[in-house]
Amino acid sequence: MKDLKDLVRPNVWNLKPYSSARDEFHGDASVFLDANENPWNMPYNRYPDPLQWKLKDRLAVLKGVDRSSIFLGNGSDEAIDLVIRAFCEPGLDSVVTISPSYGMYEVAANVNNVECRKVSLDENFDLDAEAVLESADEWTKVIFLCSPNNPSGNSLDRGSIYKILKNYEGIVVIDEAYIDFSAYPSFLKELSGFPNLIVLQTLSKAWGAAGIRLGMAFASPEIIGVLNKIKYPYNVNQLTQEKALELLNDEATMKHQVNEILTERNRLEKILSEPPFSYQVYPSDANFLLVNVAKADAMYNGLVKKGIVVRNRSNVQKCRGCLRITIGTPKENDSLLNAMKNMKL
C-alpha cells in the first residue's frame, strides 16, 4: 500500500474538521448549555453522540475489532460516498468496479466527478483479478468489490480478492452487505494484514433494519480517522443509535431469521430450477436469487398486476431475462410461486 498521505486528497489531509459541542466536552455533567439546544426534555432535545461510542462498543464485541476501526454512517451509501470524496480528486482520479454489481459505486463516483471504470465479470459472475488490476493505473485510488455480489448473489473468489489486495497499492473496498447469508467468512479478520482494506457491512439485510439507515465501515484507525474528518457532525441520529443498539443486543433473533431465510432460499432455488419452471437459478450466498425466466419483462409486469413486486434486472449487463427475487416469508414465497406457475406469457 502507498503511504496513506499519498492516497488521501491533499485538501482533505490538511483539513481541520468541524468540531461540535459534543466533540469538545469529555466527562460527566448535568447541565448542558453549550450546543444551543432546547432545554426541555422532549425527549430528543439533545444532539446525539457524534461518534456513536456505545454503538461502536457493542459492534466491537460482535465483530471482533477495536472500536477505533469502526465508522458508522447513514447507510453504507454514506461510507461509499465518503471514501470517494476522501481519496479521489474530482476530474483527475478514478475508481474501479465490477459489472454487474451494486449501482451506487458508479453513482457516487459520477456525483463526485470521478471516473468509474467497470470490469466485466464472466458468464458465471466470477471475478478476473488480472483484469481488475490491469484496469487500475496511477490515477486509480479505489477498487470496489461486492461479495456476495448484487445482483448475481454469488461470493467472489477469495483467491482473486487476495490477489487484488496483495498487488494493488490503493484502497480496496469489500462490500459485505449480504455476508450474514454466506457460507464464507467475512474479510474483517484480514484488516490487520491489509492496511488498504475497507470492509462495509449494514443492518439493512440480516438485521432487518433497513428503515433506520445504519451502515458500517471497518478499516485501520488511520482510514477511519479520515472518514470521521469529512463526515457531517451528527450523521447518525439518536433514534437510529438507540434502535440499532437494541437490535444488536438480540443477536439470537437475527440468527433465527437468517436460518429461516436460508431454508426458504434453498426451497425456492430447488423448485424454480425443476419442472414445471425449469429456470436457470444462479447460486446465491445472499438473501435473494437471480433467476433467468427468459421473458423477464412480461413476468415482471404480470407479477405486479397480482400485487407481487420483484426486481427486473433484464436491462443489466449479463442479466438479460433475469429477475432478482428477494426471499420472503414462506407465505410470500408460496404466493410468488403460485403466481409464476399460473402466469400465461
Swiss-Prot record:
Single annotated GO MF: histidinol-phosphate transaminase activity
Modified residues (N6-(pyridoxal phosphate)lysine): 205
Biological pathway: Amino-acid biosynthesis; L-histidine biosynthesis; L-histidine from 5-phospho-alpha-D-ribose 1-diphosphate: step 7/9
Pfam short name (any one): Aminotran_1_2
Enzyme Commission no: 2.6.1.9
Alphabetical UniProt keywords: Amino-acid biosynthesis, Aminotransferase, Histidine biosynthesis, Pyridoxal phosphate, Transferase
Signal sequence residues: none
Substrates-to-products reaction catalysed: L-histidinol phosphate + 2-oxoglutarate = 3-(imidazol-4-yl)-2-oxopropyl phosphate + L-glutamate
Keyword Amino-acid biosynthesis listed: yes
InterPro entries linked to this entry: Aminotrans_II_pyridoxalP_BS, Aminotransferase_I/II_large, HisP_aminotrans, PyrdxlP-dep_Trfase, PyrdxlP-dep_Trfase_major, PyrdxlP-dep_Trfase_small
GO biological process: L-histidine biosynthetic process
Names of the cofactor(s): pyridoxal 5'-phosphate
Subunit: Homodimer.
Matches recorded under PANTHER family: HISTIDINOL-PHOSPHATE AMINOTRANSFERASE (PTHR42885:SF2), HISTIDINOL-PHOSPHATE AMINOTRANSFERASE-RELATED (PTHR42885)
UniProt record similarity statement: Belongs to the class-II pyridoxal-phosphate-dependent aminotransferase family. Histidinol-phosphate aminotransferase subfamily.
Protein name: Histidinol-phosphate aminotransferase
